[in-house]
């Protein structure tokens, strides 16, 4: 398996003649330091892996100092910089041009989680209400985007634009973490100015037409009474003296017959 994978990467190793190492231990990465070139890379790897070890929790892929991914055949972990000699022999790809296929089933978790994170950020950016408490502390940029979205929906949503204290307090209190408090405070101060301006408006301005609202706002869809009454008259529901929900005790044929007779008494003969 490893020889086949090494043959696919022919001619791309910087420290081997014709692309392959001489010694099989060096080729498989079993030695402590496979080559002098790899020994020079160990010093920047210590600081890089110490920083990335807190954010990357995937066992199959291991970030390298050259922005490549080393896929291990055994369960790899994010450790110092030295290759784990106690584990199974692992084929190491230190070149960033070659991305090895995932050997185990855990290898697909990295792109899948990145896609899921992209979908979550897209959902949070388009949602009208603040859900900053659902976001982890590792994404302060998403918190800034959500605060900007709250400013966009400040004037469109009549439920949250009543006074100056509601948007300002929600912008500063719902943002988690130390980094989020600064962004929440900024959004709260900007929202308080817009809220105080909208609080002086008359009550009729709060009833915004549904065409001016964004399509994501579901619970602010208003129903016109004239349109509703025209539908009731058109369907003949005003001539029915008893509601159809009260006829659930009878069978379906009797219900449909009585319903049609009451709706059109002159056309249908029972």
Swiss-Prot record:
<dbReference type="GO" id="GO:0046697">
    <property type="term" value="P:decidualization"/>
</dbReference>
<dbReference type="GO" id="GO:0007368">
    <property type="term" value="P:determination of left/right symmetry"/>
</dbReference>
<comment type="function">
    <text>Transcriptional coactivator of the p300/CBP-mediated transcription complex. Acts as a bridge, linking TFAP2 transcription factors and the p300/CBP transcriptional coactivator complex in order to stimulate TFAP2-mediated transcriptional activation. Positively regulates TGF-beta signaling through its association with the SMAD/p300/CBP-mediated transcriptional coactivator complex. Stimulates the peroxisome proliferator-activated receptors PPARA transcriptional activity. Enhances estrogen-dependent transactivation mediated by estrogen receptors.</text>
</comment>
<dbReference type="GO" id="GO:0048821">
    <property type="term" value="P:erythrocyte development"/>
</dbReference>
<dbReference type="GO" id="GO:0007417">
    <property type="term" value="P:central nervous system development"/>
</dbReference>
<dbReference type="GO" id="GO:0030511">
    <property type="term" value="P:positive regulation of transforming growth factor beta receptor signaling pathway"/>
</dbReference>
<dbReference type="GO" id="GO:0060972">
    <property type="term" value="P:left/right pattern formation"/>
</dbReference>
<dbReference type="GO" id="GO:0007179">
    <property type="term" value="P:transforming growth factor beta receptor signaling pathway"/>
</dbReference>
<dbReference type="GO" id="GO:0001666">
    <property type="term" value="P:response to hypoxia"/>
</dbReference>
<dbReference type="GO" id="GO:0003714">
    <property type="term" value="F:transcription corepressor activity"/>
</dbReference>
<dbReference type="GO" id="GO:0003713">
    <property type="term" value="F:transcription coactivator activity"/>
</dbReference>
<dbReference type="InterPro" id="IPR007576">
    <property type="entry name" value="CITED"/>
</dbReference>
<dbReference type="GO" id="GO:0009612">
    <property type="term" value="P:response to mechanical stimulus"/>
</dbReference>
<dbReference type="GO" id="GO:0010629">
    <property type="term" value="P:negative regulation of gene expression"/>
</dbReference>
<dbReference type="GO" id="GO:0043066">
    <property type="term" value="P:negative regulation of apoptotic process"/>
</dbReference>
<dbReference type="GO" id="GO:0060065">
    <property type="term" value="P:uterus development"/>
</dbReference>
<keyword id="KW-0976">Atrial septal defect</keyword>
<protein>
    <recommendedName>
        <fullName>Cbp/p300-interacting transactivator 2</fullName>
    </recommendedName>
</protein>
<dbReference type="GO" id="GO:0061308">
    <property type="term" value="P:cardiac neural crest cell development involved in heart development"/>
</dbReference>
<dbReference type="GO" id="GO:0060136">
    <property type="term" value="P:embryonic process involved in female pregnancy"/>
</dbReference>
<dbReference type="GO" id="GO:0001892">
    <property type="term" value="P:embryonic placenta development"/>
</dbReference>
<dbReference type="GO" id="GO:0050693">
    <property type="term" value="F:LBD domain binding"/>
</dbReference>
<dbReference type="GO" id="GO:0008584">
    <property type="term" value="P:male gonad development"/>
</dbReference>
<dbReference type="GO" id="GO:0035802">
    <property type="term" value="P:adrenal cortex formation"/>
</dbReference>
<dbReference type="GO" id="GO:0032991">
    <property type="term" value="C:protein-containing complex"/>
</dbReference>
<dbReference type="GO" id="GO:0045893">
    <property type="term" value="P:positive regulation of DNA-templated transcription"/>
</dbReference>
<dbReference type="GO" id="GO:0035035">
    <property type="term" value="F:histone acetyltransferase binding"/>
</dbReference>
<dbReference type="GO" id="GO:0060971">
    <property type="term" value="P:embryonic heart tube left/right pattern formation"/>
</dbReference>
<dbReference type="GO" id="GO:0005737">
    <property type="term" value="C:cytoplasm"/>
</dbReference>
<comment type="similarity">
    <text>Belongs to the CITED family.</text>
</comment>
<dbReference type="GO" id="GO:0090398">
    <property type="term" value="P:cellular senescence"/>
</dbReference>
<dbReference type="GO" id="GO:0045944">
    <property type="term" value="P:positive regulation of transcription by RNA polymerase II"/>
</dbReference>
<dbReference type="Pfam" id="PF04487">
    <property type="entry name" value="CITED"/>
</dbReference>
<dbReference type="GO" id="GO:0010628">
    <property type="term" value="P:positive regulation of gene expression"/>
</dbReference>
<comment type="subunit">
    <text>Interacts (via C-terminus) with SMAD2. Interacts (via C-terminus) with SMAD3 (via MH2 domain). Interacts with LHX2 (via LIM domains). Interacts with WT1. Interacts (via C-terminus) with EP300 (via CH1 domain); the interaction is stimulated in response to hypoxia. Interacts with PPARA. Interacts (via C-terminus) with TFAP2A, TFAP2B and TFAP2C.</text>
</comment>
<dbReference type="GO" id="GO:0038092">
    <property type="term" value="P:nodal signaling pathway"/>
</dbReference>
<dbReference type="GO" id="GO:0030851">
    <property type="term" value="P:granulocyte differentiation"/>
</dbReference>
<dbReference type="GO" id="GO:0007422">
    <property type="term" value="P:peripheral nervous system development"/>
</dbReference>
<keyword id="KW-0804">Transcription</keyword>
<feature type="region of interest" description="Disordered">
    <location>
        <begin position="138"/>
        <end position="201"/>
    </location>
</feature>
<dbReference type="GO" id="GO:0007530">
    <property type="term" value="P:sex determination"/>
</dbReference>
<keyword id="KW-0221">Differentiation</keyword>
